[in-house]
Amino acid sequence: MPTIKCVVVGDGAVGKTCLLISYTTNKFPSDYVPTVFDNYAVTVMIGDEPYTLGLFDTAGQEDYDRLRPLSYPQTDVFLVCFSVTSPASFENVKEKWFPEVHHHCPGVPCLIVGTQIDLRDDPSVQQKLARQHQHPLTHEQGERLARELGAVKYVECSALTQKGLKNVFDEAIVAALDPPVPHKKKSKCLVL
């Protein structure tokens, strides 16, 4: 059975593990335990053909910056995650995560994933962010970032409610099986 390797990266506590556990077990985990490295496998049908979707969870904490890339070889698609309630994690997609995966795996398709969308309209979250002169990130901001970085696309979900969750992995599978062709600048011949 063919395998698709999907690696999930992003800051600590943005919901990477919850995303994977909720998708693979249909249950939302109740406790937060920082991940060092974990993997999960599910069988998915694509047309009439079964595939193994290998899901690799990684640690977002800086302590693991040297260890994390060991999970990158042979990756078919990356999910680069941020929480829509954490502007710092959104900035780190551009400053840290996208450059890191492109350094180690140039040309591998990446999706930008906004997590915890169930908290976007939560009054206590909005108040906490407002005290810091911030607000939850919008879908449009995610799409703009994906375009700016050259990601395959922007998707968002809630591991708690499962809204958009299956779509994240459906889009990852599509990107892995049919990676976009990188746009090469057309070279022009100039005769002077």
Curated annotation (Swiss-Prot):
Pfam families registered for this protein in UniProt: Ras
Lipidation (S-geranylgeranyl cysteine): C189
Residues bearing PTM Cysteine methyl ester: C189
Keywords: Cell cycle, Cell division, Cell membrane, GTP-binding, Lipoprotein, Membrane, Methylation, Nucleotide-binding, Prenylation
CDD domains: Cdc42
Keyword Iron in annotation: no
Entry GO MF terms: GTP binding; GTPase activity; protein kinase binding; protein serine/threonine kinase activator activity; signaling adaptor activity
GO cellular component entries: Cdc42 GTPase complex; cell cortex; cell cortex of cell tip; cell cortex of growing cell tip; cell division site; cell tip; cleavage furrow; cortical dynamic polarity patch
Classification via SUPFAM superfamilies: P-loop containing nucleoside triphosphate hydrolases
List of residues binding GTP: 10-17, 57-61, 115-118
Membrane topology classification: Lipid-anchor
Compartments reported by the entry: Cell membrane
Propeptide segments, given as residue ranges: 190-192
Motif (Effector region): 32-40
Presence of the UniProt keyword DNA-binding in the record: no
GO BP: actin filament organization; bipolar cell growth; cell division; endocytosis; establishment of cell polarity; mitotic nuclear membrane biogenesis; positive regulation of mating projection assembly; regulation of beta-glucan biosynthetic process
Quaternary structure annotation from Swiss-Prot or TrEMBL: Scd1, scd2, cdc42, and ras1, in its GTP-bound state, act cooperatively to form a protein complex. Interacts with gef1 and scd1.
Function: Involved in development of cell polarity during the cell division cycle.
Family label: Belongs to the small GTPase superfamily. Rho family. CDC42 subfamily.
PANTHER family: RHO FAMILY GTPASE
Protein's name according to its UniProt entry: Cell division control protein 42 homolog
